[in-house]
Amino acid sequence: MKRLITTAGLVLSFACQLFASDRTALARVTVYWPGEGSGKSAAWNGARLREDHCAVDPKKIPYGSKVIFGDAECMAVDTGPDVVKRKAARSLGRTPAERNAIVIDRFFHKKQTALAWESTHPHFMMVRIRATAEATN
């Protein structure tokens, strides 16, 4: 019985690693809100945007991945040309690492909330990206 429980525990611990992979990355985090020209109410694919959504480059962060900031967790569901081109990182970055950083655009329902969050957080920060098996398929 002990052997069965030990084997089951080991199998489950390895299975969890197969379904989720964590990595950290330096990111230039920007904000957007409805009516800013993009994200009026839906993401590029028609999905309704929520506060816990963000825009990413899908070649670097698969859709459905969790992006974990110091104080929040967002799901990658949207994209945009400035995110893919990394315009914010290239224009604001002072070091080569900052200029090569990925760009993540956090969605907020209100402009005031977005600007308040942006003003209290650094422009560049380390984020944790958790890509699940569903996100990588």
List where the protein language model places each region.
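Solvent-exposed, well-ordered loop and adjacent helix/strand elements within mature globular domains
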Residues: 19-137
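Bacterial N-terminal signal peptides
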Residues: 7-15
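Positively charged n-region of N-terminal signal peptides that target proteins for export
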Residues: 1-4
